[in-house]
């Protein structure tokens, strides 16, 4: 028997799948842990494949269940992560403000997204480790903003360590996705239900493959 549409569940109004994408070491797992559990650690080992966490938030009187997938950033895992673009409603592109190569690789990640993700997927650019001393900064905030503007994305600098803008990033992309889904509901309800059935199914199958390891 097919699973009910995501919005038919009693404990939430919307189920939103998010991906954290970016090079290894930029702090994706730290951002995920800070947002989902309110904690921070530097003792991660490298993520093997994909792991995810869930947090339910409230926006405009609606309960939004966020299913947030943490992807490995290494090149050799990119074939694994491409399968998880399917069904993703939002993608957080993360770089390390002290590592210029991780910033330059954002364009490669965007190309990867354009090849494998839905055309309507929401994207947001995140410059992490903004708590680091300015002498260690390799990517000026203005450069991050310029790249975000080029691709029509919102932009935040964050720190998982100090909790700078972590809540704001996830709430911002969730709000934009909720609005997009609500607009779709208003135009064609059957189409929206179909999208959510697919997303729910994707989340179920992927959950069985998640790794117990975490990192970056």
From Swiss-Prot:
It comes from the Eukaryota. The keyword Transport applies. One of its GO terms (biological process) is protein transport. SMART domains: ARF (SM00177), RAB (SM00175), RAN (SM00176), RAS (SM00173), RHO (SM00174). GTP binds at residues 22-29, 70-74, 128-131, 159-160. PROSITE patterns: RAB. Induction: By ethylene. InterPro entries: P-loop_NTPase, Small_GTP-bd, Small_GTPase, Small_GTPase_Rab. Pfam families: Ras. A motif (Effector region) lies at residues 44-52. A lipid is attached at residues 213-214 (S-geranylgeranyl cysteine). Residues 193-216 have a biased composition (Polar residues). Residues 185-216 are annotated as: Disordered. Gene3D superfamilies: P-loop containing nucleotide triphosphate hydrolases (3.40.50.300). GO terms for molecular function: GTP binding; GTPase activity. Involved in membrane trafficking from the Golgi to the plasma membrane. Interacts with PI5K2. Belongs to the small GTPase superfamily. Rab family. This is Ras-related protein RABE1a.
């Amino acid at each position: 028997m097919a699973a009910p549409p995501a919005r038919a569940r009693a404990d939430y109004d919307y189920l939103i799948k998010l991906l954290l994408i970016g090079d290894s070491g930029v702090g994706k797992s730290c951002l995920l842990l800070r947002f989902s559990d309110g904690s921070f650690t530097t003792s991660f080992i490298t993520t093997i494949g994909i792991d995810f966490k869930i947090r339910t938030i409230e926006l405009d009187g609606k309960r939004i269940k966020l299913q947030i997938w943490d992807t490995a950033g290494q090149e050799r895992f990119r074939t694994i992560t491409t399968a998880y673009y399917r069904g993703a409603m939002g993608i957080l592109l993360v770089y390390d403000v002290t590592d210029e190569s991780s910033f330059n690789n954002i364009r490669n990640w965007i190309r990867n997204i354009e090849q494998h993700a839905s055309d309507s997927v929401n994207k947001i650019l995140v410059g992490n480790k903004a708590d680091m001393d300015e002498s260690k900064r390799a990517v000026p905030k203005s450069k991050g903003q310029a790249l975000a503007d080029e691709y029509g994305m919102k932009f935040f600098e964050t720190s998982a360590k100090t909790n700078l803008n972590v809540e704001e990033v996830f709430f911002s992309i969730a709000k934009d996705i909720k609005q997009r889904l609500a607009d779709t509901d208003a135009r064609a309800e059957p189409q929206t239900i179909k999208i959510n059935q697919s997303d729910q199914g994707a989340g179920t199958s992927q959950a069985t493959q998640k790794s117990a390891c975490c990192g970056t």
